[in-house]
A protein has these predicted regions:
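Conserved ABC transporter NBD signature motif
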Residues: 77-89
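Conserved ABC ATPase "signature" region
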Residues: 89, 140-160, 269-270
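P-loop NTP-binding/switch modules centered on Walker-like glycine-rich loops
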Residues: 56, 191, 195, 199-280
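Conserved structural motif at the start of ABC-family nucleotide-binding domains
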Residues: 19-21, 38, 101
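A short, proline-enriched helix->beta-strand linker immediately N-terminal to the Walker B motif
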Residues: 184-188
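Short catalytic/signature loops enriched in Gly
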Residues: 4-5, 14-17, 156-160, 250-358
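ABC ATPase NBD coupling module
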Residues: 90-107, 125, 133, 139, ...
Length: 358
């Protein structure tokens, strides 16, 4: 019988836990009442590795990231759970204590670089701010550090460009500046929220390569938020698949993508048109995700699931172990485990930027 336990990853190589999220709940206040937008989300990010939060728009990926970083909008609040950064629960700390812990140890890269940067300050000033606040440097010292950061992330002529404003940079260069800001204090954890949004394919490849290099140089944990299965296949070690505010499957990318044990994950993988034949109908998941204010009783995926049964409408499945370090929230995950003899080939999921580099 499959266990309902959720143990830490057990591997021969010892992994150091940087971030452990357990049972995270996030609520939003609306004119019609409180809406649960993140529900009992749990995952672990390890030093030197990348965990991907994967799912459709509105599934709760970015809200989860904001809750971890303490950047929720005023109408949103953490309603429960533990966010432990290097063993310290950020949810139990006041604002000042949280900044002291998370400020130097956690960096975040937002998806819209133009709006994330302040238009009235030079990029050198903005990059140097972290050094002035957390390292006590003066303006001259901070500027030198900012220039070195710009050089490190591949911005040409950093001594000159440090005096430029955000609008004077291309989209790709602005994203590099955001990444530089995020890693300025050598954080233990980097959250990258859709870091290649609105960038062309070539620039996407460059940004992902930069993040990969910085992760290796700093030996930091990375939480990568994306809806792109190809990016997950190439960049992540582990994946947590989210749907309607819930993690429905979690495990090593190679395992989850080759033998998914949740119908939603399986549907996503089958929707990739890698092996599509011209003229044939493309595979897709019918319907739309439920409105978060009207989540049905039972399984959150029931209205779109080809395996739905009476129990799915009555009882919400808990995450349970389906394989080594793999967990699925499905009443019929054992059926999918049996079907894994004909697995989806994760090597067939290739990102455009990978093909561009061939």
């Amino acid at each position: 019988m499959m266990e309902l336990l959720d143990p830490q990853r057990s591997t021969e190589k010892t992994l150091t836990t940087v971030l452990a999220v357990t049972g995270l709940d996030v609520d939003i206040r609306t004119p019609t009442g409180t809406v649960r937008v993140v529900n009992k989300v749990s995952f672990t990010a390890y030093q030197g590795q990348t965990l991907a939060l994967l799912g459709e728009s509105g599934c709760g990926k970015s809200m989860t990231a904001k809750a971890i970083a303490g950047l929720l909008d005023p109408v949103a609040s953490v309603a429960g759970g533990v966010v432990a950064l290097e063993g310290k629960d950020l949810n139990t700390m006041g604002a000042r204590a949280r900044r002291a812990v998370a400020g130097p140890s956690l960096g975040i890269v937002f998806q819209d670089a133009l709006t994330a940067l302040n238009p009235v300050y030079t990029v050198g000033t903005q990059l140097g701010e972290a050094f002035r606040i957390h390292r006590g440097m003066n303006k001259k010292q901070a500027r030198l550090q900012a220039i070195e950061l710009m050089r490190r992330v591949g911005i040409p002529e950093p001594e000159v460009r440090a005096s430029a404003y955000p609008h004077q940079f291309s989209g790709g260069m602005r994203q590099r500046i955001l990444i530089a800001m995020a890693v300025a204090l050598s954080p233990r954890l980097l959250i990258a929220d859709e870091p290649t949004t609105a960038l062309d394919v070539t620039v996407q490849a460059q940004i992902m390569a930069l993040l990969r290099r910085l992760r290796e140089e700093e030996n930091m944990a990375v939480v990568l938020i994306t809806h792109d299965l190809a990016v997950v296949a190439e960049e992540a070690d582990d994946v947590a698949v989210m749907y309607a505010g819930n993690v429905v499957e979690r495990g090593p990318v190679a395992t989850v993508f080759s033998a998914p044990t949740h119908p939603y994950t399986k549907g996503l993988l089958e929707s990739v048109p890698t092996h599509a034949v011209r003229g044939d109908e493309l595979s897709s998941i019918p319907g739309s995700p439920p409105e978060l204010k009207n989540i049905p009783a039972g399984c959150v995926y029931q209205d779109r699931c080809p395996m739905v049964a009476a129990i799915c409408r009555e009882t919400r499945p808990e995450l349970r172990q389906t394989g080594e370090n793999q967990f699925s929230a499905c009443h019929f995950s054992d059926v999918l485990v049996t079907q894994a003899g004909n697995p989806t080939n994760d090597h067939s999921i290739t990102s455009p930027q990978h093909e561009e580099n061939q």
